[in-house]
Every structure is written in C-alpha cells, then in structure tokens.
Amino acid sequence: GIGMGFQNYALFPHMTVGENLSFPLEVRGMSKAEREERVTRALDMVQMGKFKSRRPAQLSGGQQQRIALARALVFDPKLVLMDEPLGALDKQLREHMQFEIKALHDRLGITVVYVTHDQGEALTMSDRIAVFNDGRIQQLGPPPVLYEQPEDRFVAGFIGENNALRGTIQELHGDKALVRLDNGELIDATAVNIRERGQVTTVSIRPERVEFKPELMPKDAHTIEAQVRDVVYMGDILRARLRVADQDDFVMKYRNTLGQVKLSPGQSIRIGWHPEDARALDPV
C-alpha cells in the first residue's frame, strides 16, 4: 500500500488518536490484536504513546503532525508520500524523526518520496534528491553530487549556502577556466555548462571551501582581495561576511579552532580556493 503524510495533518476529528491510526488497518481487514500492536508501535515511534485516547482537537499542531506521520507508517507500506511532515516539530524532535524515518526505510525497504524546502533535511535523509524549478527537474542525484557538483546556477544556489561571482571566461582549456570578474580580478574555476571564451558566467563557491591562509591555498592559484565586513560566532565555526569583487554578500566559513586567526571588520585579506571547488556555471 501507499502511506500518506500531509502538512495539514488530515486527521479525522471525531476519532481518537488510536482510532485514527487503527482505521486504515481496519479497512485492510486486520485483526483487532494486530491493529492494537501496530498502533502502539507507531505511536511509540513518534513518542506519542500516552495520547492514544485523545482527540485531535486536544493536541497541539506539532502533536497532530506526529500522529499523522504515525498513521502514514502504521501499516508498513511499500511506498510513503510525505509533504513536509516534520515542519511543525521542534528542532530536536525533527532531527530525531529524520533518523527514525531513515531507519524505517532501511529496515523495511520502503520507498519514501519526501517533499521538503529544508535543504539540510534533504541532504540528511535522502539517497537521491530531485531539485525542481518551475515544475521541471533541474538535477537528480545523490546528496554529495548535488552539493559538490551542481550542474547549473539554480541548483548551486538552492542546495546549501553558496557564493556567486559574475565574470567572463578569459581562458578555457578543457574543464579548466580562467575567469575575469567584473572588477577585473582573475580567478580559477572548473567549467561546467560553459563552452567558449568570452562567455559570461556565474562562478559558484561554497563558503567552507574559501581559504584565507596562504599555506592552505593551492600553489600558483589566483587569489583576490577581500575586505571583512563582519564575523559571526557560530560555535563550531566562524562565519565572515566579506566584500569581494564589489559585492558585500560573499561568505566564508572557517573552523573555530585553538589559535585560529581572528579577523576583524575592516580588515583586508587575500582569499582563494582550489579550482575544482569553484564552478563556472550559466550566467545570472
């Protein structure tokens, strides 16, 4: 069968939580004992066992969504369709349920088609991700491929945080490109869907791949000037916003380690990256 998990819960208001979960099992002709066993197991999975006798109106929105999720899973379906089912849950429970759904998928071999606008959730849970834009699939592949090797500007900007620099292809040798930015500076990149010299391009670089320590940059790679706008402390990492190539929204992330160089607003630095981490994509 097919299990469904909706963003708007779709629970029967006149039934208790237990009856909501038992109903699809009863329709399938399961015995009362088996229904009760499956209902108990599904409620325990979403940490809602003590609410079995409540009605939906007596539950919070987050609790109702958890019940709806349990109902989608209660009969161990072969396929589950989910429309942002975890959107109403708090962060800790949402992360717990992500791994529970993934574990259920691995244990039972069910296929889950999962709609989400949370890119982190998609990267965490998926074997394959389909990125849609205007009803068309832009790219389909495993999470590491979509994140590390986006095929166009939309995917690069949609999956994870991303920097985009506009420029023109100065030199092109196979997939190795030299790009002249709009402010005249040169950077190295990997050509993706760019075919010829003189073509306008958007170069995509992930914030965590940007380096500012000379010893971490590849030899002979071009570096460019950056001015620090602000630095935000995020615990395990530091997030610096830079002015690069006349743009104020360039982001660099680096580890918060003992003895890490401290950057200050107004400071000028040189930044660079490995050419394979910068992807020359279709223009803006």
Predicted features and spans:
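Short, conserved clusters of charged catalytic residues that mark active-site
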Residues: H96, P150, A164, T223-I224
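Non-catalytic connector elements of ABC transporters
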Residues: N162, E171-V284
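Asparagine-centered polar/low-complexity signal
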Residues: N8, N20, N133, N162-N163, ...
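ABC ATPase nucleotide-binding domains
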Residues: G1-G3, Q7-G157
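Short beta-strand-centered aromatic/proline hotspots
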Residues: G167
